[in-house]
């Protein structure tokens, strides 16, 4: 079902009232959103073509994961992955991370469920980084708020089933990370970072959500360090990075760093295996709620968020409007742990929503109920202590 992008005056008025903006401001946001949507669609295709990423569907498996079509249904493309099935599981690591700038969006939930599934079915040691110090540099958020949210994220992901015997969840306030950061930054240049910007950089810049130019570079170096750390500290041969395609620059730059570290004489080269590899799994994207390109924790109206009230969740899912029906389906498929049979039922209801909207609405109510359970779990994960910044940074 293809939805037109013409915005009516009534829609403009409703959005203006909800966002507490003038109609002119909303119209201007919409104009930018259309440009960003067109740009992002072209850019995603160009990234895949220019970097020669391999698209799904594909018959590739990752240590038997993928035999039930999981990779084809949840990922868009991959890079340098085939070799990883030949490397023993105990020589591999999975690395991903989440910025604790706000409550999890549907996009964040999607990434969490994907990495939990990868950990469970591959048996690969998994690192999840809650990047409070990276977010301090990349977003305009108070440090205490980021620390508090980081505690909540860690508790929440553990409650969802993260296996601590086969992985670790940590923040960026970590000695080993600081050591590896120095190694990574020693082989990076400003040009490397400027030539590999995040796809949504212009949108975040327009909305005044970014830190300064230097701090953004620091933030991105934090992420490269996350990827390199298992290779340096744990002597792993391979790191697999599950991430959205709009953030493909992270594993791409990390591979550049790794190649340079292998060549840097005088000690750095001895800290990485010469046969070390970095691969990436690029997940399918959930679109932002109309008119935004992607769901972002930093843009509340773009996303469905576990911090939303029950009334907001009902409005965004049940009363989403025809422009967002497909976004809700994307969420159901990607941001849930529903069984394959239940997902087939949801897809069928969506495909027939014009003639049988009642069945589709029933599916949406089931998903709303699922999200409310997650919301309750998120709220139960809240960090109860008052934040003492010094204690958190230097004692805990």
Regions found by a protein language model. Give the residues of each.
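C-terminal regions of mature proteins
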Residues: 366-396
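Active-site cores that bind ATP or allylic diphosphates and position pyrophosphate for catalysis
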Residues: 3-5, 9-13, 19, 23-24, ...
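Surface-exposed helix-capping loop/turn segments at secondary-structure junctions
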Residues: 163-165, 264-269, 377-386
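Residue-level recognition of the N-termini of beta-strands and the immediately preceding loop/turn
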Residues: 92, 124-126, 165-168, 237-239, ...
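Non-membrane alpha-helical secondary structure
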Residues: 29, 36-40, 342, 359, ...
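N-terminal Rossmann-like or analogous alpha/beta NTP/dinucleotide-binding catalytic cores
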Residues: 1-96, 100-227
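General N-terminal targeting signals
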Residues: 111-112, 143, 186, 303, ...
């Amino acid at each position: 079902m293809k939805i037109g992008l013409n915005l009516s005056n009534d829609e403009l008025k409703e959005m203006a009232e909800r966002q507490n903006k003038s109609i002119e401001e909303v119209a201007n946001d919409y104009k930018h959103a259309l440009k960003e949507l067109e740009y992002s669609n072209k850019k995603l295709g160009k990234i895949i073509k220019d970097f020669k990423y391999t698209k799904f569907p594909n018959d590739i498996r990752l240590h038997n994961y993928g035999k039930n079509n999981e990779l084809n249904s949840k990922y868009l493309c991959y890079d340098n992955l085939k070799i990883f099935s030949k490397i023993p599981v105990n020589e591999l690591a999975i690395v991903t991370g989440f910025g604790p700038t706000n409550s999890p969006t549907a996009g964040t939930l999607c990434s969490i469920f994907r990495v939990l599934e990868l950990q469970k079915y591959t048996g690969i040691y998994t690192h999840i980084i809650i990047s409070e110090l990276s977010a301090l540099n990349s977003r305009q958020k108070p440090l205490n708020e980021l620390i508090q949210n980081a505690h909540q994220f860690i508790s929440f992901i553990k409650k969802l089933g993260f296996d601590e015997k086969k992985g670790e969840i940590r923040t960026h306030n970590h000695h080993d990370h600081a050591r590896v950061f120095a190694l990574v930054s020693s082989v990076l240049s400003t040009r490397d970072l400027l030539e590999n910007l995040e796809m949504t950089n212009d949108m975040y810049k327009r909305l005044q959500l970014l830190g300064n130019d230097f701090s953004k570079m620091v933030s991105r170096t934090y992420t490269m360090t996350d990827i390199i750390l298992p290779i340096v500290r744990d002597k792993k041969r391979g790191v697999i990075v599950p991430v959205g395609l709009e953030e493909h620059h992270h594993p791409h730059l990390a591979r550049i760093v790794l190649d340079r570290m292998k060549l840097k004489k005088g000690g750095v080269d001895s800290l990485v295996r010469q046969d070390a590899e970095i691969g990436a799994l690029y997940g399918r994207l959930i679109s932002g709620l109309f008119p935004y390109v992607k769901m972002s924790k930093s843009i509340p109206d773009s996303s469905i968020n576990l911090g939303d009230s029950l009334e907001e969740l009902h409005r965004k899912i049940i009363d989403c409007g025809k422009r967002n029906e497909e976004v809700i389906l994307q969420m159901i498929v990607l941001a849930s742990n529903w069984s394959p049979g239940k997902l087939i039922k949801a897809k069928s209801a969506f495909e027939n929503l014009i003639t049988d909207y009642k069945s589709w609405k029933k599916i949406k109510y089931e998903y709303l109920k699922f999200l409310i359970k997650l919301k309750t779990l998120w709220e139960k994960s809240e960090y109860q202590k008052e934040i003492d910044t010094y204690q958190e940074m230097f004692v805990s």
